[in-house]
Amino acid sequence: AASDEITFNEKLFQRIKAVADGADTDGLNAQQTRLAERSRDAFVRNGAALNAAGKAELGRINTALSNAFTGFGQKVVADENTWTVITSEAGLKGLPDSNKAAAAAAARTRNVQGWAIVNTRSSVDPFLTFADNRALLEQVWKKFVKRGDNGDANDTKSTIAQIVALRQQRAKLLGFGNHAEWRMQDTMAKTPGAAMELMLRVWAPAKARVAEEVADMKAIAGFDIQPWDYLYFAEKVRKAKYDLDQNELKPYFELHAVRAASFYMAERLYGFVFKQLPKGAVST
C-alpha cells in the first residue's frame, strides 16, 4: 500500500525522528514541536521502527486487512442492493408523498411491480419512521439489520473473523497486547480500560433515559415496543409532546439553505468568506 511505502521509508522516518527528538534544542515553537512529535509517534505506531522482516510482515498484514475490508464492504453493499417489495398502496399508508415517489422510482428502476423499499438507511429509516403497517415495519427492519448475516455468499461472519485475527497479529507485531490497546494509544482515553470505564459511566443514565422514551412510546402504542417500532413511535411521541413534525422541518434543511448556513457559521466563527467564482474561472 502507498501508506506503507511512506511509513517504511527509513530515511524519511529518521529525518522526522531527528526533528522531533531535537525539538527542544532546535528552537521550534510549541505548535511545531507538537506536529513533529505527533508525526514521529504516528510513524512508530504504524511500524516505522520495525526491522526489515517486521516491516515485510506488517505490509503483508496491512494488505490482507485492506482486502478483507474491501470484501466486507462489497458484501454489505450487495445486501443493500436488495429490497422489500410492497404491492399495495395500503402498505405505504403514513409515508410522505416524497418517500412514496422514491419507492415507486426504485421499483421502476428494478423492474418490479409496486413499490420497493431498498435495503439502505436512506430508504429504510423514513419507512420505519412514518409507515403505519407494523408487519411491514418488522419485515423491513429485520432485512436491514441482517445485512451481511444471512448465511449466503454475502455473509460477512468469516470476513469479520479474518479481520479480528489480522488485527491481533498486527497488534502483537507492534508490541501491543491486542488491537484495542493499539487503537486507543492515540486517543484521549489512552487505554481500553479507561474507554470502557467511561462507557460504563454513561451506560446507566443512557439506559434510564431510553426506558423513559420507551415508556412514552408504550403509552401511545398500547403494547410493548419492539426494535422495529422505535422510530415510528418516537415520531409519534415527538408530535404528541412537542408538536414537532419532521416533515415540517425539511424545507429548512434544503441544500441551498444548509450551504448558506454553513458559510454563515464559517464566517462568524473563523472569518472565512465564500464567493462564487465566475464560470470557468480557476482560483489561484
List each language-model region with its residue ranges:
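Active-site-proximal, well-structured secondary-structure segments within enzyme catalytic domains
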Residues: 31, 35, 67, 74, ...
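Noncatalytic, helix-rich "gating/capping" subdomain that lines the substrate-entry/channel surface
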Residues: 1-182
